[in-house]
Amino acid sequence: MMITGKFPSLRLRRNRKTDWSRRLIEENNLTPNDFILPIFLIDGKNKKQSIKSMPGVYRYTIDKLNNIVDRAIKKGIPMIALFPYTEKRKKNDLGTEALNENNLVCRALQRIKNKYKNEIGIMCDVALDPYTSHGHDGLLQNKYVLNDETIKILLDQSLLQAQMGCDVLAPSDMMDGRIGEIRKYLDKHNFKMTQILSYAVKYASSFYGPFRDAVGSKNLLKGSKKNYQMDYRNSDEALREVALDIKEGADMVMVKPGLPYLDIIKKVKENFKIPVMAYQVSGEYSLLEHGIKNDLTDRNIILESLISFKRAGANAIVSYYADRLDQIIK
Protein backbone atom coordinates (compact mmCIF):
# COMPACT_ATOMS: atom_id res chain seq x y z
CA MET A 1 0.00 0.00 0.00
CA MET A 2 1.35 3.42 -0.95
CA ILE A 3 1.37 5.92 1.92
CA THR A 4 0.47 9.36 0.65
CA GLY A 5 0.67 12.78 2.20
CA LYS A 6 -0.48 16.28 1.54
CA PHE A 7 1.29 19.52 0.73
CA PRO A 8 2.68 21.52 2.53
CA SER A 9 3.50 18.95 5.23
CA LEU A 10 4.78 16.68 2.47
CA ARG A 11 7.40 18.18 0.19
CA LEU A 12 9.01 15.59 -2.08
CA ARG A 13 11.70 18.07 -3.06
CA ARG A 14 13.21 17.84 0.44
CA ASN A 15 14.79 14.50 -0.47
CA ARG A 16 16.18 15.99 -3.69
CA LYS A 17 17.80 19.01 -2.05
CA THR A 18 21.38 17.72 -1.84
CA ASP A 19 23.57 15.30 -3.77
CA TRP A 20 24.15 13.04 -0.75
CA SER A 21 20.41 12.80 -0.12
CA ARG A 22 19.66 11.94 -3.73
CA ARG A 23 22.32 9.23 -3.63
CA LEU A 24 20.98 7.91 -0.35
CA ILE A 25 17.51 7.21 -1.72
CA GLU A 26 18.35 6.24 -5.30
CA GLU A 27 16.38 3.20 -6.46
CA ASN A 28 18.60 2.08 -9.34
CA ASN A 29 22.30 2.23 -10.10
CA LEU A 30 24.83 0.56 -12.37
CA THR A 31 27.85 -1.61 -11.62
CA PRO A 32 30.08 -3.62 -13.97
CA ASN A 33 28.04 -6.70 -12.99
CA ASP A 34 25.16 -5.27 -15.00
CA PHE A 35 26.94 -5.55 -18.36
CA ILE A 36 27.77 -7.91 -21.19
CA LEU A 37 30.45 -6.67 -23.60
CA PRO A 38 29.95 -7.45 -27.33
CA ILE A 39 33.14 -8.12 -29.31
CA PHE A 40 33.29 -8.21 -33.10
CA LEU A 41 35.80 -10.62 -34.64
CA ILE A 42 37.60 -10.43 -37.96
CA ASP A 43 40.05 -12.72 -39.74
CA GLY A 44 43.71 -11.83 -40.05
CA LYS A 45 46.45 -10.72 -37.69
CA ASN A 46 47.11 -7.61 -35.64
CA LYS A 47 44.01 -5.77 -36.84
CA LYS A 48 41.80 -3.29 -35.05
CA GLN A 49 39.28 -2.26 -37.68
CA SER A 50 36.92 0.66 -37.14
CA ILE A 51 33.23 0.33 -37.96
CA LYS A 52 32.09 3.47 -39.73
CA SER A 53 28.47 3.25 -38.61
CA MET A 54 29.47 2.62 -34.97
CA PRO A 55 32.06 5.21 -33.88
CA GLY A 56 34.23 3.94 -31.05
CA VAL A 57 33.48 0.26 -31.78
CA TYR A 58 35.94 -2.01 -33.60
CA ARG A 59 36.44 -5.42 -35.13
CA TYR A 60 39.42 -7.31 -33.74
CA THR A 61 41.54 -10.19 -34.92
CA ILE A 62 41.87 -13.09 -32.50
CA ASP A 63 45.46 -12.20 -31.57
CA LYS A 64 44.11 -8.90 -30.18
CA LEU A 65 41.61 -10.54 -27.84
CA ASN A 66 43.86 -10.90 -24.80
CA ASN A 67 44.04 -7.14 -24.27
CA ILE A 68 40.26 -6.77 -24.57
CA VAL A 69 39.47 -9.67 -22.26
CA ASP A 70 42.11 -8.57 -19.75
CA ARG A 71 40.52 -5.13 -19.63
CA ALA A 72 37.02 -6.57 -19.28
CA ILE A 73 38.09 -8.78 -16.36
CA LYS A 74 39.92 -5.90 -14.70
CA LYS A 75 36.80 -3.75 -14.98
CA GLY A 76 34.66 -6.50 -13.44
CA ILE A 77 32.51 -7.32 -16.49
CA PRO A 78 31.03 -10.82 -15.99
CA MET A 79 30.60 -11.85 -19.63
CA ILE A 80 31.59 -11.06 -23.20
CA ALA A 81 29.62 -11.86 -26.37
CA LEU A 82 31.33 -12.90 -29.60
CA PHE A 83 30.10 -11.86 -33.05
CA PRO A 84 31.98 -12.75 -36.26
CA TYR A 85 32.50 -10.71 -39.41
CA THR A 86 32.38 -13.48 -42.00
CA GLU A 87 34.09 -12.89 -45.32
CA LYS A 88 31.77 -13.00 -48.32
CA ARG A 89 33.65 -15.94 -49.87
CA LYS A 90 32.80 -18.05 -46.80
CA LYS A 91 29.08 -17.40 -46.98
CA ASN A 92 26.58 -19.59 -48.81
CA ASP A 93 22.85 -20.27 -48.89
CA LEU A 94 23.12 -22.92 -46.16
CA GLY A 95 25.43 -21.00 -43.82
CA THR A 96 27.77 -23.98 -43.54
CA GLU A 97 30.60 -21.87 -42.09
CA ALA A 98 28.61 -21.89 -38.84
CA LEU A 99 29.53 -25.58 -38.51
CA ASN A 100 33.22 -25.16 -39.30
CA GLU A 101 35.24 -25.97 -36.18
CA ASN A 102 37.91 -23.56 -37.42
CA ASN A 103 35.59 -20.60 -37.91
CA LEU A 104 36.25 -17.30 -36.16
CA VAL A 105 34.00 -17.93 -33.18
CA CYS A 106 35.40 -21.40 -32.51
CA ARG A 107 39.01 -20.22 -32.67
CA ALA A 108 38.23 -17.27 -30.41
CA LEU A 109 36.46 -19.53 -27.92
CA GLN A 110 39.43 -21.86 -27.70
CA ARG A 111 41.91 -19.04 -27.26
CA ILE A 112 39.92 -17.31 -24.53
CA LYS A 113 38.99 -20.48 -22.63
CA ASN A 114 42.53 -21.87 -22.74
CA LYS A 115 43.90 -18.69 -21.16
CA TYR A 116 41.12 -17.47 -18.87
CA LYS A 117 39.20 -20.63 -17.94
CA ASN A 118 36.20 -19.39 -15.89
CA GLU A 119 37.47 -15.90 -15.08
CA ILE A 120 34.88 -14.50 -17.48
CA GLY A 121 31.81 -15.91 -19.19
CA ILE A 122 31.50 -16.22 -22.96
CA MET A 123 28.21 -15.88 -24.80
CA CYS A 124 27.83 -16.98 -28.42
CA ASP A 125 25.13 -16.20 -30.92
CA VAL A 126 23.21 -19.16 -32.31
CA ALA A 127 21.85 -18.16 -35.72
CA LEU A 128 22.90 -18.40 -39.34
CA ASP A 129 22.71 -14.77 -40.47
CA PRO A 130 26.48 -14.08 -40.14
CA TYR A 131 27.09 -17.03 -42.45
CA THR A 132 24.34 -17.02 -45.09
CA SER A 133 24.71 -15.36 -48.47
CA HIS A 134 21.14 -14.04 -48.21
CA GLY A 135 21.57 -12.54 -44.72
CA HIS A 136 18.74 -14.46 -43.06
CA ASP A 137 18.90 -16.37 -39.78
CA GLY A 138 17.95 -19.69 -41.33
CA LEU A 139 17.43 -21.66 -44.52
CA LEU A 140 15.58 -19.67 -47.15
CA GLN A 141 13.02 -21.12 -49.57
CA ASN A 142 10.86 -18.92 -51.78
CA LYS A 143 11.63 -15.89 -49.57
CA TYR A 144 10.47 -17.79 -46.48
CA VAL A 145 12.77 -18.98 -43.71
CA LEU A 146 12.19 -22.67 -43.03
CA ASN A 147 11.66 -23.37 -39.34
CA ASP A 148 12.24 -27.06 -38.59
CA GLU A 149 14.96 -27.48 -41.21
CA THR A 150 16.83 -24.49 -39.75
CA ILE A 151 16.65 -25.93 -36.23
CA LYS A 152 18.53 -29.04 -37.37
CA ILE A 153 21.50 -26.85 -38.30
CA LEU A 154 21.21 -24.77 -35.14
CA LEU A 155 21.52 -27.94 -33.07
CA ASP A 156 24.91 -28.71 -34.56
CA GLN A 157 26.00 -25.08 -34.28
CA SER A 158 25.03 -25.05 -30.60
CA LEU A 159 26.82 -28.29 -29.84
CA LEU A 160 29.97 -27.16 -31.66
CA GLN A 161 30.10 -23.91 -29.70
CA ALA A 162 29.55 -25.77 -26.42
CA GLN A 163 32.35 -28.19 -27.28
CA MET A 164 34.67 -25.25 -27.97
CA GLY A 165 33.99 -23.75 -24.55
CA CYS A 166 30.98 -21.47 -24.87
CA ASP A 167 29.32 -20.87 -21.49
CA VAL A 168 26.07 -19.27 -22.63
CA LEU A 169 24.42 -20.13 -25.93
CA ALA A 170 22.19 -17.33 -27.17
CA PRO A 171 19.79 -18.43 -29.93
CA SER A 172 18.76 -15.23 -31.72
CA ASP A 173 17.19 -16.85 -34.77
CA MET A 174 13.54 -16.74 -33.57
CA MET A 175 12.64 -20.19 -34.91
CA ASP A 176 9.68 -21.77 -33.09
CA GLY A 177 10.70 -24.62 -30.79
CA ARG A 178 14.44 -24.22 -31.07
CA ILE A 179 15.09 -23.73 -27.33
CA GLY A 180 13.60 -27.09 -26.40
CA GLU A 181 15.43 -28.90 -29.19
CA ILE A 182 18.76 -27.26 -28.33
CA ARG A 183 18.33 -28.06 -24.63
CA LYS A 184 17.62 -31.73 -25.36
CA TYR A 185 20.54 -31.94 -27.79
CA LEU A 186 22.97 -30.40 -25.31
CA ASP A 187 21.79 -32.68 -22.52
CA LYS A 188 22.11 -35.73 -24.76
CA HIS A 189 25.75 -34.83 -25.41
CA ASN A 190 26.56 -34.18 -21.72
CA PHE A 191 26.42 -30.39 -21.80
CA LYS A 192 23.72 -30.22 -19.17
CA MET A 193 25.29 -27.19 -17.47
CA THR A 194 25.69 -25.07 -20.61
CA GLN A 195 23.33 -22.14 -20.15
CA ILE A 196 20.81 -20.91 -22.71
CA LEU A 197 20.04 -17.21 -22.99
CA SER A 198 17.11 -17.12 -25.37
CA TYR A 199 16.45 -14.13 -27.57
CA ALA A 200 12.82 -14.85 -26.74
CA VAL A 201 11.64 -11.36 -27.66
CA LYS A 202 13.48 -10.16 -30.74
CA TYR A 203 11.59 -7.62 -32.78
CA ALA A 204 11.85 -7.04 -36.52
CA SER A 205 13.45 -3.65 -36.04
CA SER A 206 15.13 -0.89 -38.01
CA PHE A 207 17.54 -0.37 -35.10
CA TYR A 208 19.81 -3.23 -36.25
CA GLY A 209 21.37 -1.51 -39.26
CA PRO A 210 24.84 -0.74 -37.88
CA PHE A 211 25.18 -4.26 -36.43
CA ARG A 212 24.54 -5.79 -39.84
CA ASP A 213 27.29 -3.53 -41.14
CA ALA A 214 29.58 -4.76 -38.34
CA VAL A 215 29.10 -8.46 -39.19
CA GLY A 216 29.05 -7.98 -42.96
CA SER A 217 25.44 -8.85 -43.72
CA LYS A 218 23.96 -5.38 -44.31
CA ASN A 219 24.04 -5.40 -48.11
CA LEU A 220 23.23 -9.10 -48.41
CA LEU A 221 19.81 -9.20 -46.77
CA LYS A 222 17.16 -10.25 -49.25
CA GLY A 223 13.71 -9.27 -48.07
CA SER A 224 12.70 -8.62 -44.47
CA LYS A 225 12.76 -10.75 -41.32
CA LYS A 226 9.16 -10.01 -40.43
CA ASN A 227 7.98 -13.57 -40.99
CA TYR A 228 10.02 -14.83 -38.04
CA GLN A 229 11.04 -11.86 -35.87
CA MET A 230 8.34 -10.21 -33.77
CA ASP A 231 5.99 -7.45 -34.87
CA TYR A 232 6.86 -4.25 -32.99
CA ARG A 233 3.16 -3.48 -32.59
CA ASN A 234 2.70 -6.46 -30.26
CA SER A 235 3.34 -6.94 -26.55
CA ASP A 236 1.08 -9.84 -25.51
CA GLU A 237 2.85 -11.98 -28.08
CA ALA A 238 6.13 -11.24 -26.30
CA LEU A 239 4.81 -12.86 -23.14
CA ARG A 240 3.76 -15.94 -25.09
CA GLU A 241 7.25 -16.20 -26.60
CA VAL A 242 8.89 -15.97 -23.18
CA ALA A 243 6.49 -18.49 -21.63
CA LEU A 244 7.23 -21.01 -24.37
CA ASP A 245 11.00 -20.60 -24.08
CA ILE A 246 10.95 -20.97 -20.30
CA LYS A 247 8.97 -24.20 -20.63
CA GLU A 248 11.50 -25.41 -23.20
CA GLY A 249 14.46 -24.82 -20.89
CA ALA A 250 15.70 -21.23 -21.26
CA ASP A 251 17.79 -20.10 -18.28
CA MET A 252 17.56 -16.41 -19.19
CA VAL A 253 15.74 -14.35 -21.81
CA MET A 254 16.65 -11.37 -23.95
CA VAL A 255 14.56 -8.42 -25.09
CA LYS A 256 15.95 -6.83 -28.25
CA PRO A 257 16.09 -3.92 -29.07
CA GLY A 258 16.19 -2.32 -25.66
CA LEU A 259 15.24 1.32 -25.25
CA PRO A 260 12.14 1.30 -27.52
CA TYR A 261 10.90 -1.78 -25.65
CA LEU A 262 11.24 -0.86 -21.97
CA ASP A 263 7.56 -1.71 -21.52
CA ILE A 264 8.28 -5.25 -22.70
CA ILE A 265 11.21 -5.65 -20.31
CA LYS A 266 8.96 -4.57 -17.45
CA LYS A 267 6.14 -6.92 -18.48
CA VAL A 268 8.46 -9.90 -18.84
CA LYS A 269 10.13 -9.29 -15.48
CA GLU A 270 6.86 -8.79 -13.63
CA ASN A 271 5.18 -11.83 -15.18
CA PHE A 272 7.98 -14.41 -15.08
CA LYS A 273 10.59 -13.39 -12.47
CA ILE A 274 13.30 -14.84 -14.70
CA PRO A 275 16.68 -13.20 -15.42
CA VAL A 276 15.97 -10.68 -18.18
CA MET A 277 18.68 -9.20 -20.39
CA ALA A 278 18.27 -6.13 -22.56
CA TYR A 279 20.28 -5.41 -25.69
CA GLN A 280 21.14 -1.76 -26.26
CA VAL A 281 21.47 -2.41 -29.96
CA SER A 282 23.72 -0.83 -32.56
CA GLY A 283 21.12 1.65 -33.77
CA GLU A 284 20.53 2.92 -30.24
CA TYR A 285 24.28 3.25 -29.71
CA SER A 286 24.88 5.06 -33.00
CA LEU A 287 22.00 7.48 -32.41
CA LEU A 288 23.43 8.43 -29.02
CA GLU A 289 26.92 8.87 -30.45
CA HIS A 290 25.61 10.97 -33.33
CA GLY A 291 23.73 13.23 -30.94
CA ILE A 292 26.77 13.69 -28.72
CA LYS A 293 29.18 14.27 -31.61
CA ASN A 294 26.92 16.92 -33.13
CA ASP A 295 26.31 18.72 -29.81
CA LEU A 296 22.62 17.84 -29.82
CA THR A 297 23.02 16.49 -26.29
CA ASP A 298 25.74 15.74 -23.74
CA ARG A 299 27.30 12.44 -22.67
CA ASN A 300 25.02 12.22 -19.63
CA ILE A 301 22.43 10.79 -22.01
CA ILE A 302 24.36 7.50 -22.02
CA LEU A 303 23.96 6.97 -18.29
CA GLU A 304 20.32 8.02 -18.45
CA SER A 305 19.59 5.48 -21.17
CA LEU A 306 21.41 2.67 -19.34
CA ILE A 307 19.68 3.37 -16.03
CA SER A 308 16.33 3.13 -17.83
CA PHE A 309 17.00 -0.56 -18.55
CA LYS A 310 17.59 -1.26 -14.87
CA ARG A 311 14.54 0.74 -13.87
CA ALA A 312 12.43 -1.35 -16.26
CA GLY A 313 13.69 -4.56 -14.65
CA ALA A 314 16.68 -5.75 -16.70
CA ASN A 315 19.22 -7.85 -14.81
CA ALA A 316 21.96 -7.07 -17.31
CA ILE A 317 22.54 -5.05 -20.46
CA VAL A 318 24.40 -5.97 -23.62
CA SER A 319 25.99 -2.65 -24.46
CA TYR A 320 28.86 -1.30 -26.54
CA TYR A 321 29.49 1.05 -23.61
CA ALA A 322 30.12 -1.88 -21.25
CA ASP A 323 33.88 -1.35 -21.00
CA ARG A 324 33.51 2.43 -20.65
CA LEU A 325 31.35 2.48 -17.54
CA ASP A 326 34.05 4.18 -15.49
CA GLN A 327 34.02 7.06 -17.99
CA ILE A 328 30.22 7.28 -17.98
CA ILE A 329 29.74 7.31 -14.21
CA LYS A 330 31.80 10.15 -12.77
Predicted regions and their residues:
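Alpha/beta enzyme core
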Residues: 3-10, 18, 27-36, 42-330
